[in-house]
Amino acid sequence: MDEYYKLGARFAKWRAVYSILSNQPSEQCIKANAHALARYAAIVQEAKMVPIVEPEVLMDGDHTIDKCYEVTSKVLIECFKELKINNVKLEGTVLKPNMILPGSSCKKKANTDEIAKKTLDCLKKTMPKEVPGVAFLSGGQSEVEATKNLNAINKINDTNFNFTFSYGR
């Protein structure tokens, strides 16, 4: 990490991926990935850089928006628990989560307002206030869809959280 810092790096990202299936992600998977993200974040902060913590619940599959909300909530709660255990300074961390979306094969689609409300509600219930910012990933959405959803989230944002995007190639 010191070498990267000397080269000018000030942020570093680590990603953990969670698939929603009938019995997945398992509690063991959630805990193991949260621990790995937290260890990485601690190492990054020790190197005087900002960790970008990316717990991504994939939109692949036919799960409902409510199932995504449920799984994402569990994932975020466990991630923040592990970040605290590992003495990661939350005020020096950026969260890069998925938005709350139905699976790409789900027959019941969600509109932008529903996605925004569920995403904001999930973060309000799981994310400590010390976290200064959220940089959403597109997570399989087109850049246009993701941007519309981010705009809707920002319009109803009644928190001190700062929301932005981190997508595009």
Describe these PLM feature segments.
Residues 2-83:
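Helix-rich catalytic cores of soluble enzyme domains
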Residues 63-169:
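Active-site capping/gating regions of soluble enzymes
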